[in-house]
UniProtKB/Swiss-Prot annotation:
Biological process per Gene Ontology, one example term: [2Fe-2S] cluster assembly
Entry-linked InterPro entries: DnaJ_domain (IPR001623), HscB (IPR004640), HscB_C_sf (IPR036386), HscB_oligo_C (IPR009073), J_dom_sf (IPR036869)
Domain J: 3-75
Pfam families recorded: HSCB_C
Gene giving rise to this polypeptide: hscB
Keywords, sorted A to Z: Chaperone
GO (cellular component) term, any one: iron-sulfur cluster transfer complex
Name the UniProt record assigns to this protein: Co-chaperone protein HscB homolog
Length: 173
């Protein structure tokens, strides 16, 4: 795995200076702009394009808290996150997932827009709490806990996407 933190000359930390990230991105994109390679060989142009794609990929990783956490864990442990592998050891969270799914299904079936807004706020709050928890786990180098929290964040992200879908559907009525 390429190290997006190194590419952007940033410390390997979960909390990022967003202004510095933006500044570094603009500087890298400016340096790799196709106009700078107009008189270069085809190979140099291709390499600049590849490097530009790497910069864009790295930016996506650094901007997404889940991908950023996966990256930090991988850089420190050498282990890549297997997103297909589901953790069944976290029974309390599995029960929470089932409860949330049932609640969302009920909201959709009854077309309860107010209920959806309340539910959405609850999930947003849970997301913020998990972001704070993963930040702490990563700073303490508690990789197992960080993986567990990141799995929870992955579920919450999917749930938030589902909430948006239902929001759009109910808005069309």
């Amino acid at each position: 795995m390429n190290n997006p933190f190194a590419l952007f000359d940033l410390p390997i930390e979960f909390q990022l200076d967003q202004n510095r990230l933006s500044e570094r991105y603009l500087a890298l994109q400016k340096a790799l702009h196709p106009d700078n390679f107009a008189n270069s060989s085809a190979q140099e142009q291709r390499l600049a394009m590849q490097k530009s794609a790497e910069v864009n990929d790295a930016l996506q990783i650094l901007k997404d808290p889940i991908l950023r956490a996966d990256c930090i864990i991988a850089l420190n442990t050498g282990e890549q996150q297997n997103t297909e592998e589901k953790s069944t050891q976290d029974m309390a969270f599995l029960m929470q997932q089932m409860q949330w799914r049932e609640q969302l299904e009920e909201i959709e079936n009854t077309q309860d827009i107010d209920g959806l807004m309340t539910f959405s706020a609850e999930i947003e709050q849970s997301n913020k709490e998990k972001i704070s928890e993963i930040s702490t786990a990563l700073s303490m180098k508690d990789w197992q806990q960080a993986k567990l929290i990141n799995d929870r964040l992955r579920f919450i992200k999917k749930l938030m996407t589902e909430i948006e879908r239902i929001e759009d559907k109910l808005a069309d009525f």
